[in-house]
A protein has these predicted regions:
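Class II aminoacyl-tRNA synthetase catalytic cores and aaRS-like
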Residues: 2-632
């Protein structure tokens, strides 16, 4: 196996590099075991580490599968030993030799390949490497900006290799499961018309149609519905989507979702499919979950958790206003017409005075809600109320209870219409209590331990279906009702009368639109929304009515959605579906803290690709061709 050399004139030491030639890799580095002893092998990869012991030189050779120790002995071949002495971290090499059992005293039980080593007969240097800004083997992480700039180095790290492999395994399991259930994988266009769905669109100018723009899809929503109109019955796609929005830890401008749609479903039909592919996905990542997820009405979630994506590992809160007498509430300056919420955090233990004082700064009031953090003081003054509260909440020794209630000064706010299930004043109490519940649980996580993995899937992965969301939500800035999910979600059949009454009152905060429920559902895991879906509108008359309820004239609706409204007139079957965030699912399974840890080439919080230095200005010639001028 002779090597063909060429000289790098820029290398002061005239480093000789080798062509691969006809050399073929025989094994992945991390796959060799004691049973392979005596075999000839050709290994290739990066130099992870080199250790010089005089006439013996040890190289840890790394590839995707793991690390293999290569031994170069000067007594066997002085020239190969001298060549190996020039190796540095991250050089790419080929090692040709024989697999040998290690001596008993050199076996490394911490390595899968720790019983064997490759005794090298030849080393080929396939490429050199500059000194990297950090090494893949570094245990202390460098700052994220440097990691993103040199992403190709960062992705060599074991943790990132694990994350991306997990992503592949999860996506494959989902694809295989949905295919087995009769779903067709069908691609939808990336270049389509702009129909904003809440966030801003990324626009693509058309050169051949000057002054016009495509938009990158925020979701394939209308296309997948049109596929149902087209007769494909069951569709799925693991698809890239784009939203021009402000970023945070769980957002990226381009992201991947598991998108599916099916005809003639009940909500339960969609849920069964989702639970099936989630079970397959978690299994592919070495985790087990229990299916038949519990279900909770949106109103129930708000009343018990103060949020529409509750973390079921944390106890719900309890309305304890009936534990107080009217005089008690008056003395405590608590509004008797609003909920009095007891937030229970388990197994916190005795708090110091300072720790109790620290609770108030954690509280974020929504619309007049107040926190009463000293339950001990309330207990000493109102022992009967405290005993009743403890019993109603299921309080145990070491539990912390904090009360959240409305201030008496805010007034009863009873002038809400009867169709409202939760008034804004009540919602302010629930939302404030919900935020405090999460903050306290996170602050004392080391004490109660409810976030630690137990090995019991029923405790570690608390899935939930949240159902019957409001169809509309009030936008205080715009002073009108907006679609809570998107305008293609079907209202409940029982609420069509409320829709009819409110269709012309888009600017009235007391409209009956507030009580219209959507056939919408979210799947939640441990307080994180994994996905959102709904049964869709399949009748053109109802779809037009929804557009009208959102303040669109017939002309505006036709301009934005005319092609879709026309498609609905050609025998559209009932249909529904869902979309789940693949990035977020992988983030949970990999135990990562950010989506950037599970996406190969992510953007920063400023939507910048540091590796490619994108976005960038473009040539004036390109702008002229597109008919675009940039205002400075």
């Amino acid at each position: 196996m002779g090597s063909v050399n060429y000289r790098h004139s820029h290398c002061k030491d005239i480093l000789l590099l080798d062509f691969l030639g006809d050399l073929r890799r025989t094994h992945m580095n991390g796959t060799l075991r004691a049973s392979d002893a005596g075999k000839s092998a050709v290994l290739m990869g990066w130099v992870n580490k080199r250790r010089d012991h005089g006439s013996l030189l040890f190289i840890d050779l790394r590839d995707r599968s793991g690390v293999m120790q290569v031994v170069v002995n000067a007594e066997r071949n002085v020239a190969i030993h001298e060549k190996a002495e020039t190796l540095r971290n991250e050089y790419v090499i080929a090692a040709i030799g024989t697999v040998k059992l290690r001596d008993a005293n050199t076996v490394n039980p911490n390595m899968p390949t720790g019983e064997v080593e490759l005794v090298a007969d030849d080393i080929r240097i396939l490429n050199e490497s500059k000194l990297p800004p950090f090494l893949p083997s570094d245990t202390a992480l460098t700052n994220e900006e440097t990691r993103l700039k040199y992403r190709y180095i960062d992705l060599r790290r074991d943790a990132m290799q694990f994350n991306i492999e997990t992503r592949h395994n999860v996506a494959k399991a989902i694809r295989d499961y949905l295919s087995s259930q009769g779903f067709f994988e069908i691609e939808t266009p990336f270049m389509t018309r702009s129909t904003p769905e809440g966030a801003r669109d990324y626009l693509v100018p058309s050169r051949v149609q000057p002054g016009t723009f495509y938009a990158l899809p925020q979701s394939p929503q209308m296309f997948k519905q049109i596929l149902m109109i087209s007769g494909f019955d069951r569709y799925f796609q693991i698809v890239r989507c784009f939203r021009d929005e402000d970023l945070r830890a769980d957002r990226q401008p381009e992201f991947t979702q598991i998108d599916l749609e099916m005809t003639y479903p009940q909500p339960e039909s969609v849920w069964a499919v989702v639970e099936g592919f989630l079970e397959a996905a978690f299994k592919a990542a070495g985790e087990k979950i229990e299916t038949s997820f519990p279900r909770m009405d949106y109103d129930e979630a708000i009343r018990q958790y103060g949020i529409d994506k509750p973390d079921l590992r944390i106890p719900p809160f309890t309305d304890v206003r009936d534990c107080f007498t009217e005089q008690n509430l008056q003395e405590l300056a608590i509004n008797p017409n609003l909920p009095v919420i007891a937030v229970r955090t388990p197994k916190v233990g005795e708090l110091s005075r300072k720790e109790r004082d620290d609770i108030k700064p954690m509280f974020h009031s929504k619309g007049g809600a107040r926190v009463y953090e000293d339950f001990k003081r309330i207990g000493s003054k109102y022992p009967d109320a405290a005993a009743a509260i403890g019993k109603k909440c299921g309080m145990e020794e070491g539990d912390l209870i904090v009360l959240v209630a409305g201030s008496a000064q805010t007034g009863p706010q009873t002038a809400m219409p009867a169709h409202r299930k939760v008034t804004p004043a009540e919602l302010s109490i629930y939302a404030s209590a919900g935020l405090l519940r999460l903050a306290l649980a996170q602050k004392y996580a080391d004490r109660h331990g409810i976030f630690k993995k137990t090995g019991d899937p029923a405790k570690d992965y608390r899935f939930l279906w949240v159902t019957n969301f409001p169809m509309f939500e009030w936008d205080e800035g715009e002073k009108q009702w907006m679609a809570a999910h998107h305008p293609f979600t079907s209202p409940h059949e029982q609420d069509m009368g409320l829709l009819e009454q409110g269709v012309d009152s888009v600017n009235d905060p007391n409209s009956t639109l507030s009580a219209v429920r959507a056939l919408a559902y979210d799947v939640v895991l441990n307080g994180t929304e994994l996905g959102s879906g709904s049964i869709r509108i399949h009748r053109q008359d109802i779809q037009s009515k929804i557009f009208k309820a959102l303040g669109m004239t017939d002309e505006v609706a036709k301009k934005r959605f005319g092609f879709f409204l026309e498609a609905l007139e050609y025998g559209t079957p009932p249909h529904g579906g869902i979309a789940l965030g693949l990035d977020r699912i992988v983030m949970i399974l990999a135990g990562a803290e950010s989506l950037r840890e599970v996406i190969p080439f992510p953007k920063t919080a400023r939507a910048v690709d540091l590796m490619c230095d994108a976005p960038t200005p473009v040539d004036q010639k390109q702008l002229r061709e597109l008919g675009i001028s940039i205002k400075k």
